[in-house]
């Protein structure tokens, strides 16, 4: 009803690759009047243009022996395809197999030839992420190793270019000629192509003025097909993507140590489920909410429970993180983990370590991957890759240590930590609200033998340093309404300031060294019942212990805590939602 009453101001998103689900969501958005309001059809997103049907056809031809050779660029199907293990054996038996992977990943390890590509920081390239927007990727450094850009290699192999040396500009010249021949960008605005090209390189992009011809949107009442999900099992699972991505960056310690936006867990993969489901699966008495919440453990002070998720014949065993707000009967597993399970050389950060920082041995001389490969749970249905389905969950007797950067999970007093109100209320009551929403901190001291109380801003550890005449000074405010806790600012700060990565065990000891912290708070089951923050002044039936228990479907608040001493802060410029 709330969507109907506020037409044109909402947005429904399909969490499935199933065309029937997407058409249904599109029809609902149409009925709600969202097209032309919250949905812009004039700007076409050109990202993720893969074709699931072609991938499935390739897999079938590969497994049936109908292929003689294959070249892999920017893909790793042995890891990311549900039937990757079968594909690995088939690739090894081909007459020709080539990979352009930067390192010996799961697919490259099965190929006859590996021609390592430049890192993207070492290479020229061009991109068209959105219609009429074309950008240029420039190398920041010369290649560190003896690598060759994949595009240039293909040009040489096809006889379209000649490689001169390691600093060959064959692909750069190809890009330049392609832009000239095809009229890419706003070339008509410049005197000649040379001037246009120099400005494009300088600015990094060029926008085309060509008007796109969009076909008219037609929504009819044709019956949609089934979603084809087999609901014979009790649990619905979802394979989702978080900060680590789809697996390309599993060896990046910055991202491994970046706390998940919601769970705040680092260096691990896990199964998420609602707290109420945790009580049932692990046999925890929930008659007392506080003892039940304490009993499911968050894996920091005590080891987390471990569960086994079974989908068809695939089993995944992972620690469990109880996630407030998750729908009962569902579980979530993140993709991007479980790299290098066949002893491939993914990178040191992709494998588990003991408390002393030494890699764990799998018993066969190899290393133990972090987490499990969730792509094995996916399946192809009617030509599309499905990231959700149904399976079974069972408890195990095992326990596992998780590392989190935050163990206090609720606001514990919304009025004292998070100041929330509407702009109109704030504006209409500005004089009164200045003190109410941002109270001044008082400090107590003695002056001339008498007790005095002053604002904290009147005290300083340092000698007086006037700043009135120093000109512009850096300062930053953060719109908490826009902030979604993604953590991009944390990694930018980590990189800019060469902050050490300490590893999982040190994070468990609360020794993480991030200069910027992203706190996440859930609303508490008792928060609305408290009349006053001061316990002595509180009136009515109220339990302070229950403030530690999140609501079943809580509100979520993100609050960054910054270092407050950076004059050219990268956290300001990288925010993807413009909250800074």
Language-model features: locations:
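Gly/Ser/Thr-rich loops at beta-strand to alpha-helix junctions
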Residues: 17-21, 77-79
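Ferredoxin-type iron-sulfur electron-transfer modules in oxidoreductases and energy-metabolism complexes
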Residues: 464-474, 504-561, 565-573, 578
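Feature representing long, continuous alpha-helical segments
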Residues: 26, 56, 60, 65, ...
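Non-catalytic, well-ordered alpha-helical segments in soluble enzyme domains
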Residues: 149-180
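A cross-kingdom feature strongest in bacterial/archaeal respiratory oxidoreductases
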Residues: 43-47, 56-144, 160-163, 177-518, ...
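Long, well-ordered, tryptophan-enriched scaffold segments
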Residues: 1-16, 27, 34, 150, ...
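Flexible glycine/proline-enriched surface loops and loop-helix/loop-strand junctions
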Residues: 6-9, 134-141, 262, 554-559
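Anionic-ligand anchoring segments at beta-strand to alpha-helix junctions in alpha/beta enzyme folds, i.e.
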Residues: 23-57
